[in-house]
Each structure stands twice: as C-alpha cells, then as structure tokens.
C-alpha cells in the first residue's frame, strides 16, 4: 500500500508528521512518499523544510492520500495545479484524508460535496 503525503509551502508540521508517524508504525505494509507541486524542498509554517520525493507530474499511483493543514492552505485555495491534482488522484485512491484546514482544499476541489467534514472553525466560511 502506498500513502502520498501532499505538501505545500507553509504546511503545519504536526498535521503532516503526526499521522505519518502512526502510518510509519505499519512498517513494510505501507510505503510513504512525499509529493508537492514540484519535487524538492517545501517550507513548513514553522520553518523546517520537507523534501518532496515527487512533483505532481511524476507522482506514483496512490492508495492513500494525506493532506495536512496549515496557514499555507489559504493561497493554495487558488492553486489550480493543487486542486486538479487532488481531484484526479482522489478519484483513483482508496482513501483521501486531511488534517485541520487541509479539508478546505478538499472542499475547494469539490471532493467533499454532499459529505460531512470537519475543519478549523476559522475556515468555516471558506
């Protein structure tokens, strides 16, 4: 099983690495890959960078998608490359999940239409 963690500038470290730590406990049952619009370094809101293994154009097929939240969600709401990637890949994955404000991106991509979802209360109106 392959999990893709999708990163963007100013993502929240805990929103990404908390779940990844838990999934990592599955050992060989899961392969975790990191993805961003472009492969390479992606800055977190706290400063430390994560290295994206893949860009949107060369990311492998994914069984699971994890989208962290963070203040960087706001500019990503207007990023068509991000929204298209999420729409396209969520249709092929078994599970697409988000943490906190990451759900705003899933909603903007139309992936939460007709579904109940939670987010940070500051994002209710987005």
Model-inferred region functions:
Residues 1-96, 104-108, 114, 124:
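Extended, subdomain-level signal for the structured scaffold at the beginning of enzyme domains
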Residues 117:
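Anionic-ligand binding patches
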Residues 120-121:
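Class I SAM-dependent methyltransferase SAM-binding "motif I" and its flanking Rossmann-like core
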């Amino acid at each position: 099983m392959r999990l893709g963690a999708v990163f963007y500038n100013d993502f929240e470290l805990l929103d990404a690495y908390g779940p990844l730590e838990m999934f990592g406990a599955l050992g060989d049952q899961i392969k975790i890959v990191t993805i961003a619009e472009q492969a390479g370094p992606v800055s977190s809101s706290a400063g430390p960078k994560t290295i994206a293994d893949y860009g949107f154009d060369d990311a492998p097929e994914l069984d699971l998608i994890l989208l962290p939240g963070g203040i960087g969600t706001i500019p990503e709401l207007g990023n068509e490359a991000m929204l298209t990637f999420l729409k396209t890949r969520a249709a092929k994955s078994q599970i697409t999940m988000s943490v906190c404000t990451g759900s705003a991106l899933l909603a903007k991509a139309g992936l939460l239409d007709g579904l109940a979802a939670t987010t940070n209360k500051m994002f209710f109106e987005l």
